[in-house]
């Protein structure tokens, strides 16, 4: 039952026909286009209007598919009766020669007069959204698999390789003290030094891959371990400020924060030309905010340093996986501020 209005059903339908983005074309039993709304003229030109046969539609059609398979012109929807009163997907070429996907319906609306209606709804935006969601899903799986593999290799290096090398070191020391030979002692001493350096390198590699403290103790412990190692390796001081002492977050959030800050710190090392980097992590219970600040060279976002583009892009991609946002503020000769904001 229609609510009483000043407009009749006929007027309401007329208004819809004239204002909708849906493309509506009426065709008679001879295949002539007898009417179309303004929206349809994005596909069918004025020259096609009213006097043209259905081949006007055919010339714009780039193929269609039903629920089972991709169809060809041989099984044209304008000829088959199987698609009456059903939805299907069709690809049409616009006046600008762009090929766009549409959800279409072709149905007989007046059997006595042989009039059929052909309607098109542009589904390109929905398909784009679906593709983006699919890409994010695949990215999420890829990053998750990468982190799991990093964790596995890191644990293997720490629990197996380093332990075996420590056992070799012990055996080497025993050999040195067991045989009082000057040449052997000097050689053993030199090998011990090389072995010790190799153990340190593998420990650093294990932490770089994925620190066990990130999974066991959380962000703050992982950062303290990483910053200490970073200062020892590169001689750059990191000033760290935080109010999240002992707080734990979702494992995926902690991983994103760690990786984004790690990338920000490493970019500052490579490009900022500074002796100190400031890092902060703060939470108010609703948001988790991490910041990496350097007072160095800065750069133009339009012409970022060579090699940094993928890193900056990767930060944003990772942040999006946890509904976060990365903002980069930079000024030439004034430095760069990278801010990660994640709802929790």
From Swiss-Prot:
Cofactor dependence: [4Fe-4S] cluster
InterPro entries xref list: HATPase_C_sf, His_kinase_dom, Sensor_HK_TwoCompSys, Sig_transdc_His_kin-like_C, Sig_transdc_His_kin_sub3_dim/P, Sig_transdc_His_kinase_NreB
Binding-site residues, [4Fe-4S] cluster: 58, 61, 73, 76
Entry EC no(s): 2.7.13.3
Record-listed Phosphohistidine modification sites: 158
Co-factor binding comment: Binds 1 [4Fe-4S] cluster.
Disulfide bridge map: none
GO cellular component terms given for this protein: cytoplasm; membrane
Localization annotation: Cytoplasm
Catalytic activity: ATP + protein L-histidine = ADP + protein N-phospho-L-histidine
Gene Ontology MF annotations: 4 iron, 4 sulfur cluster binding; ATP binding; iron ion binding; phosphorelay sensor kinase activity; protein dimerization activity
Domain of life, source organism: Bacteria
Residue ranges of domain Histidine kinase in the record: 147-344
SMART domains listed in its UniProt record: HATPase_c
Keywords: 4Fe-4S, ATP-binding, Cytoplasm, Iron, Iron-sulfur, Kinase, Metal-binding, Nucleotide-binding, Phosphoprotein, Transferase, Two-component regulatory system
Post-translational modification: Autophosphorylated.
Function field: Member of the two-component regulatory system NreB/NreC involved in the control of dissimilatory nitrate/nitrite reduction in response to oxygen. NreB functions as a direct oxygen sensor histidine kinase which is autophosphorylated, in the absence of oxygen, probably at the conserved histidine residue, and transfers its phosphate group probably to a conserved aspartate residue of NreC. NreB/NreC activates the expression of the nitrate (narGHJI) and nitrite (nir) reductase operons, as well as the putative nitrate transporter gene narT.
Name of the protein in question: Oxygen sensor histidine kinase NreB
UniProt source species: Staphylococcus epidermidis (strain ATCC 12228 / FDA PCI 1200)
């Amino acid at each position: 039952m229609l609510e009483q209005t000043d407009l009749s059903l006929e007027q309401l339908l007329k208004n819809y026909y004239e204002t909708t983005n849906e493309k509506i074309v009426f065709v008679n039993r001879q295949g002539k286009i007898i009417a179309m709304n303004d929206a349809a003229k994005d596909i069918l030109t004025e020259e096609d209007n009213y006097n043209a046969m259905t081949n006007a539609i055919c010339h714009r059609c780039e193929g269609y598919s039903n629920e089972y398979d991709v169809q060809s012109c041989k099984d044209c929807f304008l000829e088959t009766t199987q698609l009456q009163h059903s939805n299907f997907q069709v690809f049409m070429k616009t006046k600008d020669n762009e090929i766009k996907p549409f959800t279409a319906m072709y149905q007989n609306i007046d059997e006595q007069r042989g009039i059929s209606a052909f309607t098109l709804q542009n589904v390109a935006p929905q398909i784009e959204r679906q593709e983006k969601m699919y890409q994010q899903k695949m990215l999420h799986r890829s990053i998750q698999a990468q982190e799991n593999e990093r964790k596995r290799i890191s644990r293997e290096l720490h629990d197996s390789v380093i332990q075996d090398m420590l056992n070799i070191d012990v055996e080497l020391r025993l050999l040195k003290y067991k045989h009082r030979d000057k040449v052997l002692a000097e050689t053993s001493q030199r090998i011990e030094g090389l072995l010790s350096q190799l153990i340190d390198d593998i420990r650093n590699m294990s932490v770089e891959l994925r620190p066990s403290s990130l999974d066991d103790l959380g962000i703050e412990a992982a950062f303290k371990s990483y910053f200490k190692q970073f200062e020892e390796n590169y001689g750059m001081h990191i000033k760290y400020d935080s109010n999240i002492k002992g707080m734990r977050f979702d494992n995926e959030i902690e991983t994103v924060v760690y990786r984004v800050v790690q990338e920000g710190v490493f970019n500052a090392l490579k490009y900022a030309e500074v002796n100190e980097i400031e890092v902060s992590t703060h939470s108010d219970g609703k948001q988790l905010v991490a910041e990496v600040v350097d007072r160095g060279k800065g750069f133009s976002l339009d012409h970022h340093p060579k090699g940094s583009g993928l890193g900056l892009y990767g930060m944003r991609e990772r942040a999006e996986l946890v509904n976060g946002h990365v903002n980069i503020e930079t000024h030439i000769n004034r430095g760069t501020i990278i801010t990660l904001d994640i709802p929790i």
